[in-house]
Amino acid sequence: LKSACLMLQYLTNGITKKLSDKKLEIKKTFQSPTMAPFCEDGEKYQVVDSIIKKIKNTKEKGEKVGSQTIEKIITINGIRFELLNGSWGLVRASSNKPSLVIVIESYESHDEVELIFNYINKLLDQTGKVGKYDQTLTR
């Protein structure tokens, strides 16, 4: 209860807008499920390193993912790349099972989530070391 009150205080501190109006200002997002394609424990970190190099290469060449360029790359525990419009994709090795972790979020559309997924999946396929996904994209 205390945390809920503190959150309301934070959200309304010095603001004269109604909370319902503030909610309308939040951008809609489209997310993928957290997907986990199979990858052997002994290979998953090398696969992620390979994906990092390929995504950095895409950025350096100015190539597009869908209709967007890659604007930012974070390589802590895998790779998170952010597109010009703020949408992003994440690829990392699972810490507790033989798989990778793939997550995607778009501020534009579910179609863009699919474009980002197709980009990531193509890179993973090129390694020849990634198997079946535990789940796939749904609408």
Q: What is the meaning of each model-derived region?
A:
Residues 1-103, 109-139:
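Phosphate-binding and adjacent anionic-ligand microenvironments
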